[in-house]
């Protein structure tokens, strides 16, 4: 196993070295959605999303301070995380591009909080804003999950700065039981 140290211990790390190292962590791909104050939908592709707590059920998403969508996350009381399936790479790219009309030809429906939910997502977590924390050049938005929708399928993944796909899993004898 080889390693390529880019900084000496205790000297800090530059942004490019940090990004290259973090790119080695495989993540799922999601689109986070929110409404603005006039009720218009907004969304953005993210991979900086994670679960935080089971009781209460909390998730977080990190929004860059330069992102246009940040203002909507600072004023809205709800948002959603739409976890993408492997066939939704084009949708991920559409919501990652700069521009205001990302919802132009995208089908969506309003969840119980009113936020846009994507019907073909692998899973959707609808959240009430629980807390916002400024940290470095991002705002961490923590949401309490008020609704969860799950479908069968395989996730879209991101690793080493590129989209990836899983091999289909081997058949299992266990059943998935969602409760609550």
Model-derived segments and spans:
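Basic, polyanion-binding surface patches
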Residues: 1-180
């Amino acid at each position: 196993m080889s390693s390529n140290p880019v900084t000496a211990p205790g000297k800090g790390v530059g942004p490019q070295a940090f990004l290259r190292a973090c790119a080695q962590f495989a993540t799922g791909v999601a689109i986070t959605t929110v409404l603005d104050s006039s009720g218009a939908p907004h969304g953005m592709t993210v991979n900086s999303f994670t679960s935080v707590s089971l009781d209460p059920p909390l998730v977080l998403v990190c929004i860059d301070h330069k992102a246009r969508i940040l203002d909507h996350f600072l004023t809205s009381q709800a948002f959603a995380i739409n976890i993408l399936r492997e066939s939704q790479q084009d949708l991920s790219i559409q919501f990652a591009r700069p521009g205001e009309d990302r919802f132009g030809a995208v089908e969506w429906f309003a969840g119980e909080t009113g936020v846009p939910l994507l019907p073909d997502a692998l899973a959707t977590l609808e959240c009430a804003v629980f807390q916002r924390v400024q940290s470095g050049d991002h705002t961490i938005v923590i949401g309490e999950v008020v609704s969860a929708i799950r479908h069968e399928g395989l996730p879209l993944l991101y690793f080493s700065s590129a989209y990836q796909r899983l091999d289909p899993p081997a058949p299992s004898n266990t059943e998935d039981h969602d409760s609550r």
